[in-house]
Structure formats: structure tokens, C-alpha cells
Regions:
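RNA-interacting cores
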Residues: 1-187
Length: 187
């Protein structure tokens, strides 16, 4: 049963990486025909399901329109390195969206690292991720995202525009929590 008041966190994160491409208006112009899709999750069984699903689709052409089709050529699993410190420099492969939902008006606002209340909302998102995915983490949830070489951007998706954070940051917090976020994503 759908409950609009219950925000659901996903147990994975992903990024689509286009090499040598640029955005021109509403189109992505490719100068290289290769792209990478990177998945990560703290749910090993989900990763295995995804991996096996993609194996079945290897060398199958998926056509999106008359000018664009893709074909999965290579698929491999890369072990994630364990974070050994309470602070790590990270670079986002895709924009960070931190959603602040107002239940009374049922409206969303997307915060960037420059907005007041960003740190609190980011920690609320992390808390929801931990709770909704039944992750055994019993310490106080507290992370800090400090901009290093960061910027904000407007991200278009399905006719909507979102405020997002991009670039490099220092992420600090408990080591166990940082490793959970390394696998499952942030935001």
C-alpha cells in the first residue's frame, strides 16, 4: 500500500559516466561512444541480482529512438576499498540531491551545501537510509560535508529542475558510517 508520508530510501547508488561529452541545451553530445554505469550497495544480494540481470543482457542492443541505441559489452565487479579514517575526500560522480520534504504542504525543496539547514537535512537523510534499510548502526548519526572544490548546479529530470551539489568534498564522521555511505550512497 502506498503511503505518501513515508519517504523510502534506496539501498544502492549509481552514476552514469559519459566520457568526452558535453551538454548542449536539452541534449548530451557524445564525442566518445562509450559510457559507464557504476552501481554500489551495502545489499550484496541486490548487487548479485543486478549483476546476473546485466549478464543476461550482454551484447543485446537496446534502442531508445532512431538515433540512439546502447549495447552492454563489458561487465565486471570491482571491490570497494574500506575507509580507514574518520575523514575522506570524495568526488561526486553524479549530483547530490538533498531533499527536504514538507509534509503539511506535500512540497519538496532541494538543498545545496550553501543552504541554511543543509547539514541537518543531510544527517536526516543518512538517518533515514540507516533506519529504512535495517542497517545495524547504533551510534549517533553525524556526518559533515565540507566543500573543497565544490559547486552547485540545476539538474533537469523529467521536466523538473532540482538544486544539486557537485564536485569534491571532505566527508567526516564515524568510520563505520562512512563505509556504509561509501557503499549505499549519500543523499
Amino acid at each position: 500500500q502506498y503511503n505518501k508520508d513515508l519517504t523510502k530510501s534506496k539501498s544502492f547508488t549509481f552514476a552514469v559516466v559519459f566520457k568526452d561529452s558535453k551538454i548542449s541545451g536539452d541534449e548530451i553530445v557524445f564525442n566518445d561512444e562509450h559510457l559507464s554505469v557504476i552501481f554500489s550497495s551495502f545489499d550484496t544480494s541486490l548487487l548479485l541480482y543486478l549483476y546476473n540481470s546485466f549478464i543476461k543482457k550482454r551484447n543485446v542492443t537496446k534502442r531508445f529512438n532512431k538515433n540512439f541505441a546502447i549495447q552492454l559489452k563489458r561487465l565486471y565487479m570491482v571491490p570497494l576499498k574500506t575507509i580507514e579514517a574518520d575523514s575522506v575526500t570524495i568526488k561526486f560522480l553524479s549530483p547530490l540531491l538533498v531533499r527536504q520534504h514538507d509534509r503539511e504542504t506535500n512540497k519538496d525543496r532541494y538543498l545545496t551545501f550553501r543552504d541554511p539547514g543543509f547539514d541537518e537535512q543531510l544527517n536526516m537523510c543518512v538517518k533515514n537510509l540507516i533506519e529504512q534499510n535495517n542497517i545495524d548502526y547504533r551510534k549517533e548519526i553525524s556526518v559533515k560535508l565540507i566543500p573543497v572544490n565544490a559547486k552547485t548546479a540545476l539538474v533537469k529530470n523529467m521536466g523538473l529542475i532540482f538544486n544539486a551539489s557537485l564536485g569534491e568534498y571532505t566527508l567526516s564522521g564515524d568510520r563505520q558510517l562512512l563505509n556504509i555511505l561509501h557503499k549505499g550512497g549519500l543523499g
